[in-house]
């Protein structure tokens, strides 16, 4: 990992996919704030074009050059950038311009105060989050693959169709299932799609993976938590409908057929997520999920 100490962030990149003018204004304000403090600032090329700024860079260039990446947007933006930038080991920090903000935890109204604490005073922590790698194997060869920070969801292309499959963990048969699909979630993703399907919440530091059935056709089907270093593979009944799909973080889709085998395991890439020094996961969790406050 790149060395990160007080005032060691010299080259900082700004990325995100602004959906409205307010978010775009945040990009410009952060750019000007960083330039005023004599940082070398890179801007993702599409944003740079919209704002008519210099130093527009492709994501790959940002990963190779930047010491820190500021993601401005919602969790969806952070997910996309995590998949693209994790392999470069560059830390990411998020300014929330979306809805939930589990991953982008800097509030826009206090962004500059919090960035000052982080960048100028070195008051930050870095958390490591692992990703999953999903592969499609056809006739013994990997034909496509992608990463996911939240979850790998395996389901029919058409909605309201069941599929039947077998799940193997570390090459050992675990269970078979008839359902609308299966969610394979990281601890990061345990508060996303997995949670809405009845899955457990896993704290981010756990080395664990959750297997969560989607509308199973048996009352005995329950979520299962396994070791994070497990290798998961799925085989599908040949009479399933021909068009199946892997969805990575709900953003990237990989089509496959019942003849293919699906392999899911921990990716070698690690997301380095930067938080302010006073970051508390349980405070964020309680706030987002509406938990009760302290009694004493």
From Swiss-Prot:
Catalytic activity: NAD(+) + ATP = ADP + NADP(+) + H(+)
Enzyme class, UniProt record, top EC level: transferase
Entry EC no(s): 2.7.1.23
Record-linked InterPro entries: ATP-NAD_kinase_N, ATP-NAD_kinase_PpnK-typ_C, NAD/diacylglycerol_kinase_sf, NADK
One Pfam family of this chain: NAD_kinase
Taxonomic superkingdom: Bacteria
Stated name of the protein: NAD kinase
Organism from which the protein derives: Haemophilus ducreyi (strain 35000HP / ATCC 700724)
The encoding gene: nadK
